[in-house]
């Protein structure tokens, strides 16, 4: 490509389907977030006399943020790190994109250097020890530490990185990708799922990558064997098996566009504590296996409550679009958040569904020892529910101590409501909203770069 080009992918919040999303039987609701990961692909460069490709991925927002890899068709497109700095997510993206497209060295002898700059919006990382710069209409933070040393907020930075880097790297091989992201969205998604699972060393549910590719969605996962059955990267059959998986295999996956109702918005609260998701998941799995059939009954109740929650949001969305007197009364009642809310089933259905979800997670917390909704979070959520304009609130994702999600009327300002209130002293409201769109092309790519 002879032109500079930029792409971005959203973060995520899993609002319904925590733990159940790991099972192919259950659907989940994933909201894409306005916090985005960005990739700027530079025009082709040339390494004269080289029989290898070189990929340079740079992240100027972090100390020592540069990763160099050589890739050769002769060695099965296995990336070889140059200079010692490695990143498993970048490495697996490179391996899979090259293995899928199988570029011929003769066709790229004068354009075998690929340079990509990565940027992340503020909300993904702690802002301590950072300097903020404005690049175009974007606010970017530049950190004094290495990327692995900067605390993350749990919005899906690795899935966003893998998805947007897959898109940017693929644009070197697909001339019309920049202006036709929709055309290649499924290929991008499938390649990113493979790379992300390999980089993590496990076959996750994939909801975070799906949200990065598609935005806000209703999601049911793919069978793990699709990816675990792939041969080793670099093997003689890897490229053909990967291409078959990406292009021809039935993934048996559900990805349906879905979104929060018009007139409502999402607030994400970052709590100054952390949870180890892997340990939580393992504790819940151990509990589930040892408490059958009671655990299956709880999961079934959770699934039904998740469906009622999603269906209730859809009803509110349709209602808001009517703009009639009844709709106005409901949203006025919600703004006051007083006893009049009990008159409207459109409000109580959502709240009752979330109450069931939270009650089930508290039961699992008590029986498994996994702090999905520990008492301190229960108190915080109950306090949030009393705020003006709040429809409902819950623990997103796998739960724990590190985040809350609150759905409110569109024009509500939770920062103003909770300022100087000791009950919310540990909550930092993140500068994010819902984003219905997934990976996409960005305008004015030159505005990302130093002048």
From Swiss-Prot:
Gene encoding it? ERG8
Q: What family does the entry list?
A: Belongs to the GHMP kinase family. Mevalonate kinase subfamily.
- EC number assigned by the record: 2.7.4.2
Question: Which compartments does it reside in?
Answer: Cytoplasm
BP term (GO), one:
ergosterol biosynthetic process
Q: What does this protein do?
A: Phosphomevalonate kinase; part of the second module of ergosterol biosynthesis pathway that includes the middle steps of the pathway. ERG8 converts 5-phosphomevalonate to 5-diphosphomevalonate. The second module is carried out in the vacuole and involves the formation of farnesyl diphosphate, which is also an important intermediate in the biosynthesis of ubiquinone, dolichol, heme and prenylated proteins. Activity by the mevalonate kinase ERG12 first converts mevalonate into 5-phosphomevalonate.
**What is the protein named?**
Phosphomevalonate kinase
Entries under InterPro entries matching the protein: Erg8, GHMP_kinase_N_dom, GHMP_knse_ATP-bd_CS, Phosphomevalonate_kinase, Ribosomal_Su5_D2-typ_SF, Ribsml_uS5_D2-typ_fold_subgr
Q: Which GO terms describe its molecular function?
A: ATP binding; phosphomevalonate kinase activity
GO CC terms in record: cytoplasm; nucleus; peroxisome; vacuole
A UniProt-annotated Pfam family: GHMP_kinases_N
Which class of enzymes does this protein belong to? transferase
Q: Does the keyword Kinase apply?
A: yes
Binding residues for ATP: 150-160
UniProt keyword list = ATP-binding, Cytoplasm, Isoprene biosynthesis, Kinase, Lipid biosynthesis, Lipid metabolism, Nucleotide-binding, Steroid biosynthesis, Steroid metabolism, Sterol biosynthesis, Sterol metabolism, Transferase
* Further comment found in the protein's record: Present with 79 molecules/cell in log phase SD medium.
């Amino acid at each position: 490509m002879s032109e500079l080009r930029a792409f971005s992918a959203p973060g995520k919040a899993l609002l319904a389907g925590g733990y159940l999303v790991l099972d192919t039987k259950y659907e989940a609701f994933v909201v894409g977030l306005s916090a985005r990961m960005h990739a700027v692909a530079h025009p082709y460069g040339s390494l004269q006399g080289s029989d290898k490709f070189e990929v340079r991925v740079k992240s100027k927002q972090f100390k020592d943020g540069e990763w160099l890899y050589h890739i050769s068709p002769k060695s099965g497109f296995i990336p070889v790190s140059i200079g010692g700095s490695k990143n498993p997510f970048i490495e697996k993206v490179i391996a899979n994109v090259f293995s899928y497209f199988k570029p011929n060295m003769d066709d790229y002898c004068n354009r075998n250097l690929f340079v990509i700059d990565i940027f992340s919006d503020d909300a993904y990382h702690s802002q301590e020890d950072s300097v903020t710069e404005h690049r175009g209409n974007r606010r970017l933070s530049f950190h004094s530490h290495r990327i692995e040393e900067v605390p993350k907020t749990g919005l899906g930075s690795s899935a966003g990185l893998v998805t947007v880097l897959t898109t940017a790297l693929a644009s070197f091989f697909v001339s019309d990708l920049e202006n036709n992201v929709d055309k290649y969205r499924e290929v991008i998604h499938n390649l990113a799922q493979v790379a992300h699972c390999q980089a993590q060393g496990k076959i996750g549910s994939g909801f975070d990558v799906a949200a990065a590719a598609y935005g806000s969605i209703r999601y049911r996962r793919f069978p793990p064997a699709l990816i675990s059955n792939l041969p080793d990267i670099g093997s003689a059959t890897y490229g053909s098996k990967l291409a078959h998986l990406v292009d021809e295999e039935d993934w048996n996956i559900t990805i349906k566009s879905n979104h929060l109702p018009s007139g409502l918005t999402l607030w994400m609260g970052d709590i100054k504590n952390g949870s180890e998701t892997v340990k939580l998941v393992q504790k819940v799995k151990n509990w589930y296996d040892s408490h059958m059939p009671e655990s299956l009954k709880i999961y079934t109740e959770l699934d039904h409550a998740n469906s009622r929650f999603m269906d209730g949001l859809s009803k509110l969305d349709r209602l808001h679009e009517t703009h009639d007197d009844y709709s106005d009364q409901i949203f006025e009642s919600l703004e006051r958040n007083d006893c009049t809310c009990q008159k409207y089933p459109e409000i109580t259905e959502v709240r009752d569904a979330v109450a069931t979800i939270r009650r089930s997670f508290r039961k699992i917390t008590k029986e498994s020892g996994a702090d999905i909704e520990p008492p301190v979070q229960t108190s915080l959520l109950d306090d949030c529910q009393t705020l003006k304009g709040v429809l409902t609130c819950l623990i997103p994702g796998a739960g724990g101590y590190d985040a809350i999600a609150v759905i409110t009327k569109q024009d509500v300002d939770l920062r103003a409501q909770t300022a100087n209130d000791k009950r919310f002293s540990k909550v930092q409201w993140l500068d994010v909203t819902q984003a219905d769109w997934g990976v996409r092309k960005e305008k004015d790519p030159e505005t990302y770069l130093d002048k």
